């Protein structure tokens, strides 16, 4: 079985969010269970230079973008057993950022056609092309209308994964003719039209053979008007083809027993070493050094989706108590300024770090007692999975993948690996934090919760198997 992943980013080459983590990890775990996987992404100037130098130039050709023919170079390397391709065009991809440009529609129109043209150019025919998010949504459209009849391309199947339905790639309807050489009937019949625009996301959903998303609960949620972003009706109509598969994390990268980024390695049988991480980070971040004070962590993009609005409503009530808060991330200016304000007013209780640093993130995961993730919605979420791995107890809102992966602590049975609340409300969040702090003060109970958290299995080994089953259902 041959599967080609097409995506807009992949760790470790280039990353802006969780999509890159999935594309950088899942293929390796699929390979371990017998799937021949390859990956293709754009050749951005932002790709780390020491990794970019590992790629070898294969060939070049020209890709039609409307009436123009655009240069396309193909580079290849093998990384951790998986073959990666880079699609090169300096005009489209040598820019300061990956996304957010006026011509993003044209950039990914080029990429989507280049992926299909590349297959013939390098004589590689996958059984399945696995597309990811809106950036690759036009690949199955182009295939079924312009490529399917060719003997070389015949028989290829498509999986389209929704990592976040909010971002839909909606562009002016004129791009169908101007960039894809497609007639307006696709827009008029509604198969690619959404809210008066051509939607790459809707196109991918409509023209793929199977659809997946990154947790079971999110698969149900996006079929409702509340979460469906005006695509709930389409998703309900395709519910029999919609799979919800929870993301995993790479247990080799996130391993408190071997992690060389943290102060002291530990496991569930040696939690005293976790405490050493806590005392060290309190010292480094100029917080009061006290092992009995619960340390709460936020490692996140600062956006409304991540629950920042309800955190703002309780921030001062929270940190004026006997707790500490460590914040790491960037995002909307109003949230950055709020966290700066908290740390200036409560400098011994709050450490605000308005940037992202992977080493510091690992240290915070290892050192903290609790991890806040009160998302408005969350397709899957990786932060809570990493926190579990490090015995840092997640406090989450019951939505999407958070609901699937965090089992609320039950004081009667002793079961559970975290704490959760249902309503998107600051008072409810504060109440559940207070409950967690109460249990934190009862060390035997708390250590039991930590042990359960560290025993949770969220490795990609678990998630790769249902993906293989999904592929097999198409063959």
Swiss-Prot record:
List the catalysed reactions: [(1->4)-alpha-D-glucosyl](n) + ADP-alpha-D-glucose = [(1->4)-alpha-D-glucosyl](n+1) + ADP + H(+)
Q: Where does ADP-alpha-D-glucose bind?
A: 15
Gene3D superfamilies xrefs: Glycogen Phosphorylase B
The protein's Enzyme Commission number:
2.4.1.21
> Which keywords appear in this protein's UniProt record, sorted alphabetically?
Glycogen biosynthesis, Glycosyltransferase, Transferase
Q: What class of enzyme is it?
A: transferase
What highest taxon heads this organism's lineage? Answer: Bacteria
Q: Which pathway is this protein engaged in? A: Glycan biosynthesis; glycogen biosynthesis
Which Gene Ontology terms cover its molecular function? alpha-1,4-glucan glucosyltransferase (ADP-glucose donor) activity; alpha-1,4-glucan glucosyltransferase (UDP-glucose donor) activity
Please provide the Gene Ontology terms (biological process) for this protein: glycogen biosynthetic process
Where would one find the signal peptide in this protein?
A: none
The cross-references to Pfam families, in alphabetical order and at most eight, read: Glyco_transf_5 (PF08323), Glycos_transf_1 (PF00534)
Which protein family is named in the record?
Answer: Belongs to the glycosyltransferase 1 family. Bacterial/plant glycogen synthase subfamily.
Job description of the protein: Synthesizes alpha-1,4-glucan chains using ADP-glucose.
* Name of the molecule in the record: Glycogen synthase
Its gene? Answer: glgA
